A protein has these predicted regions:
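Glycine-rich phosphate/pyrophosphate-handling loop used in enzymes and phosphotransfer proteins
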Residues: 1-150
Length: 150
């Protein structure tokens, strides 16, 4: 998006901190929330199985949990940008920052129609904007599984 349109959008819909709602100059997290978030220490890995290692920037609790639930279930699609930045930074710091492909696990057609967006795809796109690349759709949802949370 060019800077003019981005500035125009920010004039009418200014970026807000996803945790406290404070209006910001740019998309991101306010300094107060940045300091108080439940960060996962770099030396802690969330999951390791054979050659697969997963990591997360934040623990899923409190304000983080609430913001992610807004993103997923309550029309908070704008939250994908700040969370995408966090994911991009975490992956670059913990895994070296060079990746062959970024993809996502899509939602079912039923959930896509109900929400109006695929939060996983939005997160993948936001991560890729920080790495100047594009996500690649590698997976298709063939079955509508029961919701894991809500």
């Amino acid at each position: 998006m060019n800077r003019f349109f981005e500035s125009l959008i920010n004039l009418f819909f200014p970026p807000k901190c996803p945790f406290c709602g404070k209006i910001l100059d740019t998309v991101g997290i306010c300094p107060k929330c940045e300091r108080s978030l439940p960060w996962v220490p770099e030396e802690e890995v969330a999951f390791t199985e054979k050659d697969l290692t997963c990591a997360a920037p934040l623990w899923y609790e409190g304000a983080v949990r609430e913001a992610l639930l807004r993103l997923k279930f309550r029309g908070g699609s704008a939250l994908a940008e700040p969370f995408g930045e966090l994911l991009a930074r975490c992956a670059a710091e913990r895994f070296g920052g060079e990746f062959d492909t970024v993809t996502w696990v899509p939602v079912s057609q039923k959930r896509l129609e109900a929400r109006g967006y695929d939060q996983s795809r939005l997160l993948a796109e936001a991560v890729c904007r920080h790495w100047d690349t594009r996500p690649v759709q590698l997976l298709n949802k063939v079955q509508d599984n029961p919701a894991q949370s809500g």
